[in-house]
Amino acid sequence: MKTVIGIPAYNEGKNIASILLRLKNISEHIIVCDDGSSDLTSEIAEKLGAIVVTHTKNLGYGAAIKTIFLKAQEINADALVTFDADGQHRIEDIDKILVPIKNNKADIVIGSRFLNDKQKISKYRKIGIKTITELTKITS
């Protein structure tokens, strides 16, 4: 199964190298959508072997995700995992997310940090995350 990892990135020059180096162990097919960065995000990602698609100006998270989906389709991906460039997602969760797809039990899998009771997140932080998520949706 050709698994592609898609990373939307905006001014992630400080983070992108470490993320890409760790993700190379999971998939050799990594797409980085540089969403109008003014730093070296694209250059670093290219040097590390990622497929880089660049927006000339910042179009927002939604546009970056759409670009990643289109590129993944173009390169005939069987599965696409989106992954944040800032290191918030856990690389070790990728295999777990892919299991239902590999076993033909699901066409789409959505992960949530709120489903696991082991990870206690304060109400204050949950409200903050939900607020920022909604603001991002409105502005994208």
Segments from the language model and where they lie:
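Cell-envelope/extracellular polymer assembly enzymes that use nucleotide-activated donors
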Residues: 2-4
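Short, well-formed alpha-helical segments that are part of the catalytic scaffolds
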Residues: 6-26
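Conserved sequence signature across two-component system core domains
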Residues: 9, 33-35, 55
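Residue-level preference for short helical/loop micro-motifs built around acidic side chains
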Residues: 14-18, 39-43, 63
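Short, structured coil segments at secondary-structure junctions
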Residues: 26, 48-49
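A conserved acidic beta->alpha catalytic loop
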Residues: 34-42, 87
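Acceptor/aglycone-binding surface of glycosyltransferases and processive sugar-polymer synthases
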Residues: 55-74, 91-140
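Short beta-strand-to-loop acidic/aromatic patch adjacent to the donor-nucleotide binding site
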Residues: 77-88
